Structures are given as structure tokens and as C-alpha cells.
């Protein structure tokens, strides 16, 4: 009798459970003339992450990738709160070159963010890495971010340049160009209930 009660209770409770909002992620993407394929994904209920790689790259060894981040907005955060959180995380982890904008800039309630992060080479990762992102707050859905990442091998002669000069070069020739690509990118990510 107890087993039947437990099973019935579980069935009733499972019927009351809310279904998680799902993002309509494509299995492949075209970006900057490259073909990217969904290679990995993780869903932690409040946040989901989807990674796209272009052939011949792999998850372990890639030169460029696209990541779609889906935050179901639990707890709910505004775009300005998201920017403040990111800035704090990057400062606390020693990343020095990053910038985020709330769009529209003069709005009291912006619904989009744009930004970039430049990672300096380390012993574990000898390449420079540039991440350029565009994110939107979608009503009845959550926050969705499209991020393009590119690794840049450090040429021998650039080892003699200061970090600031390399960062300015990356901002001019990668960040600025990719930010324009993202601004012109047609937004095709939406939620399904």
C-alpha cells in the first residue's frame, strides 16, 4: 500500500512540475563564411550552453568557435546587473581587457548587451583569445548570448611588443570587425515553451 501511495504521489508531483523553457538552437551555423556544427552542449536547468566548432577543429583544439549561452533568468537579472557581474568576475580573475555596453545606451531598461574580452597568453594556453558577444533579454524566455571566439597564435616578433600594443592591435583588427559582424547578424534565436 505504501508503494502505491509513493508512486501516485510521484506521478501527481511530476505532473505539476514546470517544463523548462527551451531555446531553438540550430545544429549548424554559418558565420563569416565558415560552417560551424553543434559539437557540445550542457544544460544545468537555469543555464544552458551550446558550442559550435568548424572542421577540422575539435573541442580540445580549436581556432574559432561559437558559443550560445541561454540563461533562463533565475534569479532574474537586468542587462545592467549582468554587465556589473561580468565586470566583477573578469576583474577578480585577472582579465584586464574587456568592455561591455548596454543597448540602447541611454535607456533605463536596456534589453541587449554587446561586449568583448581579450585573454592574454598563459603557460596553459599560449595563444591570445578574443571573445566578442551579443546578448539579448527575450521576454518570456530569458537571456540569450551569441559569442564568437577566436584564438590567435602569438607570432615570434609580437613577443617583443608590449601587452598594450598587442591588445590595441587585436581590438582594431579583430574586436572592431567582429563587433560590426555581430551588429549586422540577423537574430535567429528564440524560445519554445
UniProtKB/Swiss-Prot annotation:
This is Uncharacterized protein HI_0983. It comes from Haemophilus influenzae (strain ATCC 51907 / DSM 11121 / KW20 / Rd).
Amino acid at each position: 500500500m505504501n508503494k502505491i501511495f509513493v508512486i501516485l504521489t510521484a506521478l501527481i508531483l511530476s505532473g505539476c512540475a514546470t517544463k523548462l523553457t527551451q531555446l531553438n538552437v540550430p545544429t549548424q551555423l554559418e558565420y563569416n563564411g565558415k560552417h560551424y556544427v553543434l559539437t557540445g552542449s550542457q544544460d544545468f536547468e537555469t543555464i544552458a550552453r551550446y558550442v559550435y566548432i568548424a572542421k577540422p577543429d575539435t573541442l580540445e583544439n580549436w581556432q574559432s568557435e561559437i558559443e550560445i549561452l541561454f540563461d533562463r533568468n533565475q534569479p532574474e537579472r537586468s542587462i545592467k546587473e549582468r554587465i556589473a557581474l561580468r565586470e566583477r568576475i573578469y576583474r577578480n580573475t585577472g582579465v584586464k581587457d574587456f568592455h561591455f555596453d548596454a543597448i540602447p545606451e541611454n535607456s533605463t531598461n536596456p534589453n541587449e548587451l554587446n561586449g568583448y574580452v581579450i585573454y592574454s597568453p598563459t603557460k596553459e594556453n599560449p595563444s591570445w583569445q578574443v571573445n566578442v558577444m551579443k546578448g539579448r533579454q527575450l521576454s518570456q524566455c530569458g537571456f540569450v548570448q551569441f559569442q564568437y571566439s577566436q584564438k590567435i597564435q602569438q607570432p615570434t616578433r609580437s613577443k617583443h611588443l608590449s601587452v598594450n600594443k598587442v591588445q590595441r592591435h587585436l581590438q582594431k583588427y579583430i574586436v572592431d570587425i567582429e563587433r560590426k559582424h555581430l551588429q549586422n547578424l540577423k537574430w535567429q534565436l528564440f524560445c519554445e515553451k
